[in-house]
């Protein structure tokens, strides 16, 4: 069965797909879409179970990737934030001819911590899963707060994310639960060497969900990739440091151009 996700397309230029993270929806990109649309044809999606795709319910990891690929442009750059980074990476591995460049933001091929690998402790993920059953709205709000922790403008960042996300229908609780399972279980580390397109990895140095050590450990997994660290950012650098973020993104996507914001 083909399931149609909700997409928005704005601007003119080369195609750029933006994929949101857990508990969020495509509206989270709106502040930067306005700036990017002067240079790119920007495609934002609400993943299955989120925003205007909430009624589609839950989809597992491979289904989510297939759903996005089914409606994405024939060939474009893909940018995934957090959980969206896993989806963008898997799409690049599954259909390398469709992904011209891969950008991951505040993402990790393995979100869960384990011996020798920094990440989210399994107890924290379990706690979120339990809290979801009691009050999923409050759980998503807590997650937003966790994302902005460490950022100098944390309160402002949370407010902006919340406003954008709450402008669309609430996420489907089963999709939220599936998303946490993906964050707990998926491990793409051993597949990363198969990536054939240019890769850019962006991180916030103060990120509490994707520790900065992951950024450095990843150098060994994708040695020829571009690494960008936003020194004062946490988990959402495209919100807290949008101008710097867009400059770095453009530098990677179109290195021959000078970009004026």
UniProtKB/Swiss-Prot annotation:
Q: Which domain of life is it from?
A: Bacteria
Q: How does it assemble?
A: Monomer.
What NCBIfam families does the database record attribute to this sequence? Answer: bioH
Q: Which Gene3D superfamilies match?
A: alpha/beta hydrolase
Its localization reads:
Cytoplasm
Tell me its family: Belongs to the AB hydrolase superfamily. Carboxylesterase BioH family.
Q: Which GO terms describe its cellular component?
A: cytoplasm
Please name the pathway.
Cofactor biosynthesis; biotin biosynthesis
In this chain, substrate is annotated as bound at 22, 82-83, 143-147, 235
Q: What name appears for this protein in its UniProt entry?
A: Pimeloyl-[acyl-carrier protein] methyl ester esterase
Q: Which organism is it from?
A: Aliivibrio salmonicida (strain LFI1238)
